[in-house]
Regions:
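Active-site-adjacent substructure of cysteine-protease-like catalytic cores
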Residues: 149, 153-182
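Active-site-adjacent structural elements in enzyme catalytic domains
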Residues: 1-159
Length: 182
């Protein structure tokens, strides 16, 4: 019955549009934007090198940390992390980094994957701790909203330039065009 209703609606629209002359588009189309993120990292293998481990194995990175680091790769920022941060992880206990004691980021090596992705793995670990990653061998997770506080706190981004916008806050048509205004 639902299929019948959908067919009826589609037929009605087809008849309606056939009876009207075609009009030129009133809005200019948006220019195509090439992908901004040029890297393709994942959560396992050499990328998890600095993640915590125990007798059950080594935790994977977590998609929030990967996404955050990939976004940071576009600006190749910061030159170095700063501050310190720690939290209690459910699985691996207290996780802490004194970012001030960490070396500067080598963005050329990060973007090229040189050094066996060691620089990438360190960046991913930094991001994971900064967003309170709940590390696990089979899956690591956290709230993506934590990115908005981690970027200014440990990575030198201005508070005014970081904004958390949940995808579900916008209808599909509107969310498609969010990036054009940035």
């Amino acid at each position: 019955q639902r299929a019948h209703r959908l067919t009826s609606v589609a037929e009605g629209w087809a008849k309606e549009s056939a009876s009207r002359p075609l009009r030129a588009a009133t809005r200019a189309t948006k220019a195509a934007v090439a992908p901004l993120i040029k890297v393709n990292w994942n959560q396992s293998g050499s990328y998890k090198k600095y993640c915590p481990k125990d007798g059950n194995g080594q935790a994977i990175v977590g998609c929030v940390a990967v996404g955050m680091a990939q976004a940071m790769s576009v600006a190749q920022w910061p030159k170095r992390p700063s501050g310190e941060f720690g939290y209690d992880s459910k699985t691996y206990g207290y996780q802490y980094i004194n970012y001030d004691k960490e070396p500067a980021y080598n963005w050329d090596a990060i973007l090229s994957g040189a050094n066996g992705n060691d620089d990438v793995a360190r960046l991913l670990w930094h991001c994971g701790v900064a967003v309170r990653m709940n590390y696990g061998v089979d899956g690591s997770g956290t709230q993506d909203s934590y990115i908005a506080t981690a970027l200014p706190r440990n990575f030198g981004y201005q508070d005014s330039t970081v904004k958390y916008v949940p995808r579900q806050s916008y209808p599909d048509a509107q969310s498609t065009h969010l990036g054009y205004g940035e």
